[in-house]
């Protein structure tokens, strides 16, 4: 093919207009500990910090890159395009540790991608000459650097490693078809033929251990997950539960095998360290186990609820029983008939159904001298042991619905289920199969809808519609999809994806769409994806052969929602549907026209001749949709597609869409097609962030105000850049736009603010210096209160200038502005002015008729009421679907208050509008998702029998609970009693077990600590012992614990990171940091040093008033009381926090803003995020991405995109 330049100029190539700069990249956990860091990396100047972080963290090759390279001579390949390998002679001059490193420049990554594609394209004669190859290389590097397009993640992970650096490895059992001979070959190298495909569909036979069977599938899946890809399978071939086996006996059923596959997938991170495995499980609606499949995730969610509740109740009541065994002396204390306290705790335990044998076990342990039982409390966090314990958490589930089933639902008809063996036997014998069971279709429909409402699964795939648009039905039906449901083709095939950033093709001056530039991009990226098929290796023989035979591609786009907003067009409108159809048609038909051009030179795909009439029928139907043909004109369709309505489409876009449709059909009829499929709409999760897209795939925006990451760390608030352009398109003046934008994102200054402004604060005692600090922090503040905390103002100013004691401003929930006399209404007014409302509703000058242009997937800000309906999501999908080979991966968001009937309507409308697949997500349908309404409903509700619980679990002796204590240094050591109370806390810090033991005085004050890390080696262990002794001596000489806490928290060294086994603390920067966080929380009430709020706990706090009693040589120890006592410090009273306060009182977090965990969830949801935390970096910036989640901070996803 002859290539022409479009974006680059000959003399300068790809870098002609690209400015480069050096940046640092650092991703941290919420506590400040480092997840990833890279310094002085070369990147395009225009890239955001998020894009830089994702490229550096996820897509840079981190090791194995030689410092010196040399070219490998190859006949017919120009020198600039030849492979490189390590230059061993030059490397020998370096120290061994300096010879290999990682990529440090975006240009290196772009070079290995574009160079590898160009190399394979040139080698197999995709270009007419060397000049065309050079143009192709330059244009691709330019498009990558300017964020116009990006390939799927496996390309970034794997492509070009061998070509650019000579990186290789042992073969992992892959296969490829040699392009020169057409013969299947087993790979001898891990990277010479890369695995660039993200999406796979695999078959499974009803066979346990042979090739192609059930256990073989898990091996094939593992091979895909290892290299960062996702896979889907239709499991309808597997026999149902109790279905007869050929050798006698009954089948264990489909579900038993799905659980094995779920466990296998859960154990693997996709791409090694990048993401967890992603898989799709499909099942036909006539399978005998369909009801169990539908209920799978609903049932597992119930198990999670039971595990969490049960663990908390067991921990509380069993420890209360153990404590009661030490309420009196002698053997009678173990007899509930003699020990009234023990009797009461047993009665309470039996009320909540604690197992009798566990109650007996605890009493037996107490009789043996044990004083505590470690009963881990599980949580509803989706990464917790509760979710890890149950099945069904590692796949997206979908049901294949036929037109016959949907008609049966419409008409309230019966629906038959069939044993697999009977169905196969009837097919062979040419008769009608006998049903194994008959249900009412509507009952099954109700079950599907309830499950989706309750657990967000199963999704639906419309089998008949999918196969009516199938280009190759002679080779079998389409049975399944990839995990995100955009790739739909034959079993044992693969698809590699790429997405265009539509925003790059909108001229921000004229607000016209650059049709010619978009066409050029679609042509080049179709060629890239086709070359990728040529160079690829695959995880099995079948996939290698069939992917080579059909050569399916997955070109798509992102940022459609932003483009519509920039153009001033509501997402939910006829204009949006028409423009979506036109853009999709231009992309799709340009890709098919390019495929036909390649077929002219390379020949059509192997399976084309057999399927020619079907494929041309499908292409003609695509063309008819571009012309908005009447329903009677379409061939072989039962549901009429949504065509491009000329009344609502800009004429130049409509003309281009129809021209491209004409060209694709005419070239295809003449030359055939090189590819059976060319387009999908993927969720573009991580790659969408690399391209700095505001919206992913076909999605609308999720918020109008965003928080942009700064290069030096932190965030600042910006308006979605689509908003001012959209307002300009709607005719608003610059001054009106400025007022509307300021209403949304805030003025970021106190000047002119109502009530709380510079003058008012000066009257309260604020100095000019402090006011400057406040002003400087306002652009970064989400809430005005964040600018008025001790970290920003300084403790000296608060104590000396404002006269506020440390005890007051350190107290949880302290608000300086309220303390200064401003009312909540005053603060809200000032907050709206300074920090913005986060919504456009009720903005000055904005006409209500223009509100729909700025509607988002969620309500915006705390005042926002508007959001896009599920119907609008479905309509925009319906507009694009007639111009997509595969399907559309999209989240259809529903509010929490959506009812089951809404789910039914959404699924039914999707079928009626010819959508191929649908996934719904109702806010709060996952138990793991924090939900504002739940927090608001339950906040402040206390347990009715609080006093009974206290009687059963807390020592009644109120000695020194409210005693005023003055702490001072004492020259003589205050000795601890020979027998002393205390507690033992076991935890794991960064994978290392730590045992912390405390010893206390009779009054409950801490007097000593013991630290044991018994597997860490003699030297380290001895140092920890010595450190514990020195701290203990200090405590016994009167050094306040608070001093140690201030000195040693945030102390950083290895081991560090994730903490498990502790209720409050989930992250620490070192073992020392963890120890003093734990002591501060237990003895000082410093919940700000933990990551889990006390209101999240259910009465398992370690009591700090522990009376000591002699009884048969054993001490009495309250192990799980409902009272936490704050350790006294100079001139402070000991504060007692009741159990009810623990539930309702918010804790400060460890962040400088001092907000609670509950508040953090609420704020995240106000910003448009889901309220979930990221498993990689801990931020609360998760958004829905297809049927998965994506972190807007570090780019991690819970799926395969």
Swiss-Prot record:
Q: Which residues form the active site?
A: 482 (proton acceptor), 484 (cysteine radical intermediate), 486 (proton acceptor)
Q: Which UniProt keywords apply?
A: Cobalamin, Cobalt, Disulfide bond, DNA synthesis, Nucleotide-binding, Oxidoreductase
Cross-referenced InterPro entries, in alphabetical order?
RdRp_reductase_class-2, RNR_2_N, RNR_lg_C, RNR_NrdJ/NrdZ, TSCPD_dom, YebC-like
**Which regions are flagged for Basic and acidic residues bias?**
1100-1118
| Region annotated Disordered, chain positions | 1100-1120
What does the record give as the reaction this protein catalyses? a 2'-deoxyribonucleoside 5'-diphosphate + [thioredoxin]-disulfide + H2O = a ribonucleoside 5'-diphosphate + [thioredoxin]-dithiol
**Cysteine-cysteine disulfides:** 199-495
Residue positions binding substrate: 153, 198-199, 230, 482-486, 683-687
- Cofactor details (free text): 5'-deoxyadenosylcobalamine (coenzyme B12).
GO biological process terms, semicolon-separated: DNA biosynthetic process
Q: Which Enzyme Commission numbers does its entry carry? A: 1.17.4.1
Q: Name one GO molecular function term.
A: cobalt ion binding
- Family the entry assigns: Belongs to the ribonucleoside diphosphate reductase class-2 family.
Query: What does this protein's UniProt record list under function?
Result: Catalyzes the reduction of ribonucleotides to deoxyribonucleotides. May function to provide a pool of deoxyribonucleotide precursors for DNA repair during oxygen limitation and/or for immediate growth after restoration of oxygen.
Listed name of the protein: Vitamin B12-dependent ribonucleotide reductase
**What species is this protein from?**
Leptospira interrogans serogroup Icterohaemorrhagiae serovar copenhageni (strain Fiocruz L1-130)
């Amino acid at each position: 093919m002859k290539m022409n330049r479009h974006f680059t100029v000959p003399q300068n190539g790809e870098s002609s207009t690209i400015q480069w700069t050096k940046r640092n990249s650092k991703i941290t956990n919420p506590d400040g500990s480092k997840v990833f860091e890279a310094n002085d990396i070369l990147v395009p100047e225009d890239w955001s910090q998020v894009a830089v972080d994702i490229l550096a963290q996820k897509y840079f090759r981190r090791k194995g890159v030689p410092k010196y390279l040399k070219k490998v001579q190859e006949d017919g390949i120009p020198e600039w395009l030849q492979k490189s390998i390590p230059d061993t002679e030059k490397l020998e001059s370096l120290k061994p540790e300096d010879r290999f490193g990682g990529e440090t420049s975006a240009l290196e990554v772009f070079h290995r991608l574009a160079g590898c594609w160009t190399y394979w394209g040139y080698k197999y004669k995709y270009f007419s000459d060397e000049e065309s190859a050079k143009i192709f290389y330059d244009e691709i590097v330019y498009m990558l650097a300017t964020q116009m397009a990006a390939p799927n993640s496996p390309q970034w992970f794997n492509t070009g490693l061998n070509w650019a650096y000579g990186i290789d490895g042992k073969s992992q059992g892959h296969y490829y078809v040699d392009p020169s001979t057409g013969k299947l070959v087993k790979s001898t190298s891990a990277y010479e033929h890369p695995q660039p495909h993200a999406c796979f569909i695999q078959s499974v036979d009803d066979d346990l251990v042979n090739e192609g069977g059930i256990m073989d599938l898990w091996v094939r899946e593992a091979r895909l997950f290892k290299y960062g890809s996702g896979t889907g399978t239709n499991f309808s071939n597997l026999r149902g539960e109790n279905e007869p086996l050929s050798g006698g006996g009954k089948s264990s059923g489909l579900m038993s095998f799905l659980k094995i596959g779920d466990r296998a997938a859960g154990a693997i991170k996709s791409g090694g360290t990048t993401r967890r495995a992603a898989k799709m499980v499909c099942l036909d609606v006539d399978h005998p186990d369909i009801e169990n499949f539908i209920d799978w995730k609903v049932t597992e969610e119930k198990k999670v609820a039971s595990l969490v509740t049960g663990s908390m109740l067991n921990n509380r009541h069993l420890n209360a029983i153990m404590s009661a065994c030490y309420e009196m002396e002698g053997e009678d204390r173990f007899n509930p008939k003699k020990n009234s306290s023990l009797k009461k705790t047993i009665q309470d335990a039996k009320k909540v159904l604690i197992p009798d044998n566990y109650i007996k076990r605890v009493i037996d342990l107490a009789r043996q001298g044990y004083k505590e039982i470690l009963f881990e409390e599980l949580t509803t966090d989706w990464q917790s042991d509760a979710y890890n314990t149950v099945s069904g958490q590692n796949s997206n589930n979908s049901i294949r619905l036929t037109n016959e089933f949907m008609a049966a639902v419409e008409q309230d008809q019966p629906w038959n289920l069939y044993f697999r063996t009977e169905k196969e036997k009837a097919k062979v014998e040419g008769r009608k199969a006998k049903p194994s069971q008959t249900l009412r279709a509507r009952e099954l429909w109700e079950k599907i809808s309830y499950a989706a409402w309750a657990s967000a699964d199963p999704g639906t795939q419309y089998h008949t519609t999918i196969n009516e648009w199938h280009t190759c039905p002679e080779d079998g039906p389409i049975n399944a999809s990839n995990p995100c449901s955009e790739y739909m083709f034959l079993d044992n095939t693969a698809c590699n994806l790429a997405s265009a950033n539509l925003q790059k093709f909108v001229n921000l001056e004229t607000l016209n769409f650059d049709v010619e530039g978009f066409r050029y991009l679609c042509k080049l990226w179709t060629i890239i994806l086709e070359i990728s098929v040529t160079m690829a290796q695959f995880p099995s023989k079948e996939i290698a052969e069939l992917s080579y035979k059909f050569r399916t591609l997955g070109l798509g786009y992102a940022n459609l929602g932003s483009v519509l907003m920039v153009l001033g067009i509501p997402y939910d409108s006829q204009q949006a549907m028409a423009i979506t159809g036109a853009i999709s048609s231009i992309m799709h038909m340009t890709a098919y026209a390019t495929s036909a051009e390649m077929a002219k030179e390379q020949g059509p795909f192997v399976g084309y001749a057999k399927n020619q009439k079907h494929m041309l029928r499908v292409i003609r139907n695509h063309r008819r949709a571009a012309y908005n043909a009447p329903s009677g004109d379409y061939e072989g369709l039962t549901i009429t597609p949504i065509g491009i309505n000329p009344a609502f489409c800009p004429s130049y876009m409509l003309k281009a869409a129809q021209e491209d449709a004409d060209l694709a059909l005419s070239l295809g009829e003449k030359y055939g097609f090189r590819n059976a499929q060319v387009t999908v709409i993927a969720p573009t999760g991580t790659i969408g962030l690399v391209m700095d897209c505001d919206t992913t795939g076909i999605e609308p925006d999720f918020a109008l105000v965003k928080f942009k990451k700064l290069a030096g760390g932190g965030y600042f608030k910006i308006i979605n850049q689509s908003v001012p352009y959209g307002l300009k398109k709607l005719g608003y003046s610059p001054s009106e736009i400025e007022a509307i934008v300021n209403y949304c994102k805030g003025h970021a200054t106190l000047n002119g603010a109502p009530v709380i402004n510079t003058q008012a604060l000066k009257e309260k005692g604020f100095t000019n210096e402090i006011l400057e600090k406040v002003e400087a922090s306002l652009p970064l503040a989400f809430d005005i209160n964040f600018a008025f905390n001790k970290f920003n103002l300084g403790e000296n100013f608060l104590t000396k200038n404002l006269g506020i004691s440390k005890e007051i401003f350190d107290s949880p929930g302290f608000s300086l502005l309220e303390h200064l006399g401003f009312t909540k209404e005053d603060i809200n007014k000032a907050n709206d002015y300074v920090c913005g409302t986060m919504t456009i509703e009720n903005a000055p000058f904005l006409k209500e008729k223009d509100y729909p242009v700025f509607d988002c997937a969620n309500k915006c800000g705390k005042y926002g009421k508007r959001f896009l309906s599920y119907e609008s999501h479905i309509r925009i999908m319906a507009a694009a679907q007639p111009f997509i080979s595969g399907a559309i991966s999209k989240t259809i968001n529903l509010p929490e208050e959506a009812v089951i009937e809404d789910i039914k309507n959404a699924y039914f409308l999707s079928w009626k509008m010819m959508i191929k697949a649908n996934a719904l997500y109702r806010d709060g349908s996952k138990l793991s998702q924090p939900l504002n309404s739940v927090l608001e409903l339950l906040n402040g509700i206390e347990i009715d029998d609080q006093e009974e619980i206290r009687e059963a679990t807390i020592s009644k002796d109120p000695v020194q609970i409210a005693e005023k204590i003055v702490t001072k240094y004492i020259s003589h050591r205050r000795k601890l009693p020979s027998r002393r109370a205390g507690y033992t806390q076991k935890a794991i810090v960064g994978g290392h077990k730590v045992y912390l033991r405390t010893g206390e005085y009779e009054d409950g004050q801490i007097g000593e600590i013991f630290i044991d890390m018994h597997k860490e080696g003699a030297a380290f262990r001895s140092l920890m012992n010595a450190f514990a002794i020195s701290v203990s001596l200090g405590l016994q000489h009167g050094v306040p614990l608070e001093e140690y806490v201030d000195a040693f928290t945030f102390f950083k060294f290895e081991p560090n990171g994730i903490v498990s086994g502790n209720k409050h603390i989930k992250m620490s920067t070192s073992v020392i940091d963890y120890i003093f966080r734990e002591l501060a929380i237990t003895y000082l009430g410093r919940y700000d040093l933990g990551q889990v709020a006390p209101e999240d706990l259910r009465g398992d706090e370690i009591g700090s008033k522990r009376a000591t009693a002699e009884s048969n040589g054993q001490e009495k120890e309250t192990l799980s009381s409902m009272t936490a006592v704050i350790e006294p410090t100079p001139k402070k009273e000991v504060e007692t926090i009741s159990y009810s306060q623990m539930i309702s009182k918010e804790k400060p977090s460890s962040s400088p803003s001092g907000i609670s965990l509950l508040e953090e969830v609420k704020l995240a949801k106000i910003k448009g995020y889901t309220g979930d935390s990221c498993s990689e970096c801990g931020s609360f910036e998760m958004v829905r991405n297809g049927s998965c989640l994506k972190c807007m901070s570090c780019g991690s996803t819970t799926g395969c995109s």
